[in-house]
Curated annotation (Swiss-Prot):
The keyword Transmembrane applies. This is Reticulon-3-B. One of its GO terms (biological process) is vesicle-mediated transport. It is found in: Endoplasmic reticulum membrane; Golgi apparatus membrane. Homodimer. Keywords: Endoplasmic reticulum, ER-Golgi transport, Golgi apparatus, Membrane, Transmembrane, Transmembrane helix, Transport. GO terms for cellular component: endoplasmic reticulum; endoplasmic reticulum membrane; Golgi apparatus; Golgi membrane; neuron projection; postsynaptic density. Residues 26-214 form the Reticulon domain. Pfam families: Reticulon.
């Protein structure tokens, strides 16, 4: 058993390190550490979502593929004509990219799969816990959230909510970073009120329904 624990622990450590690295990359992206990179991701995401709001997903994918092919085919023809006029033999303009190894390694695939599987298992465990009412208060919170979502869904469609989500994701961190002290103060007040109300509700519940002490 001691021999097998070493590779497993190292694999888990590498997965955790990968998760931390990806988390830092997302954080830097949302906090606009690199304005050019964040702007490209934000702009590209918004263009895609706005396109999906106006056209069907099949049309959007078709237009994207046609746009990409228009660029690559035009560049390929341009370089071929240029080589014919200048009588040069530079070869295929995309040869370095065609010869580049873009295959996904088994190690990278296994790391990504292990990381994704851990998140999926955690989500499944939380879903089962909520739907089977392990904690009544948490299940009631989910019911209240879903009830509110019915009203939100009646006003906004899925694409509109995604657009609003992207806007909030790329603007809220900047606002929070600028007004961190004030926001933390009000969040603390709200958290205290919610905690107080939750404790009052739990105190009135029968013993079998109260949250199990950890």
């Amino acid at each position: 058993m001691a021999e097998t624990s070493g590779p497993q622990s190292s694999h888990i450590s590498s997965s955790s390190a990968g998760d931390k690295g990806s988390g830092c990359a997302v954080r830097d992206l949302l906090y606009w550490r690199d304005v050019k990179q964040s702007g490209m991701v934000f702009g590209g995401t918004m263009v895609l979502l706005l396109s999906l709001a106006a056209f069907s997903i099949i049309s959007v994918i078709s237009y994207l593929v046609l746009s990409l092919l228009s660029v690559t085919i035009s560049f390929r023809v341009y370089k071929s004509v240029l080589q014919a006029v200048q009588k040069t033999e530079e070869g295929h303009p995309f040869k370095p990219l065609l010869e580049k190894d873009i295959a996904l390694s088994s190690d990278s695939f296994q790391k990504g799969l292990s990381s994704s599987l851990a998140h999926v298992n955690h989500a499944l465990k939380s879903i089962v816990r909520l739907f089977l009412v392990e904690d009544l208060v948490d299940s009631l919170k989910l019911a209240l959230l879903m009830w509110l979502m019915t009203y939100i869904g009646a006003v906004f469609n899925g694409i509109t909510l995604l657009i609003l989500g992207v806007l909030l994701a790329f603007t809220t961190p900047l606002v929070y970073e600028k007004y961190k002290v004030q926001i933390d103060h009000y969040v603390s007040l709200v958290h205290s009120q919610v905690k107080s109300i939750t404790e009052k509700i739990q105190a009135k519940l029968p013993g079998a329904l109260k949250k199990k002490s950890e």
